[in-house]
Regions:
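Terminal amphipathic alpha-helical/low-complexity segments used for targeting or macromolecular assembly
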Residues: 1-52, 56, 130
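Left-handed beta-helix
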Residues: 56, 61-62, 67, 75-76, ...
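Extended, positively charged loop/linker patches that create polyanion-binding surfaces
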Residues: 118-120
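A short acidic, helix-capping loop that chelates divalent metal ions and anchors anionic groups
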Residues: 113-116
């Protein structure tokens, strides 16, 4: 039986201090989300400013949600579509020329439902080069998708 009052996020789990986390969430909710669709370089700049590794000519829409950008790598010419969620509790790597379409959910984190305190955990996700994840694809923690794969 779970006792959720004992839940806590392990020290260092987020990969950054609380101030940086809160600052990113404020920037994402304003400067990132309110930017016009065509301002891809602006959003790439914001992500790089928070530690993301972003390749050249990346297309990332303003409605994309990224939990911790310092755990994100996007290869050259990668696209991330409207309303996609990159839940970066663990590392997410998206290869060059890969497409993560609208409303996809890449989820690196979960909970151990068997632990008394519902312990949180994370595993990386790797999307290879020239992949296409079509609309509404869910990718679970620890999944690696090979180069050239189409899912949807």
């Amino acid at each position: 039986m779970q006792e959720l009052s004992g839940f806590s996020v392990p020290k260092g789990f987020r990969g950054a201090g609380g101030i940086k986390v809160q600052l990113w969430w404020a920037v994402q909710a304003t400067l990132f989300a309110w930017s016009p669709q065509i301002m891809y370089r602006w959003r790439a700049f914001l992500l790089r400013s928070f530690g993301a590794k972003i390749g050249k000519n990346v297309v990332i829409r303003p409605s994309v949600k990224i939990t911790y950008p310092w755990k994100l790598t996007l290869g050259d010419n990668a696209w991330v579509g409207d309303d996609a969620v990159l839940y970066t509790l663990g590392e997410i790597s998206i290869g060059a020329n890969a497409v993560v379409s609208q409303k996809c959910y890449l989820c690196t984190g979960s909970h151990d439902y068997m632990s008394q305190h519902f312990d949180i955990n994370a595993q990386p996700i790797t999307i290879g080069e020239k992949c296409w994840l079509a609309t509404d694809v869910f990718v679970a923690p620890g999944v690696s998708i090979g180069n050239g794969t189409v899912i949807g």
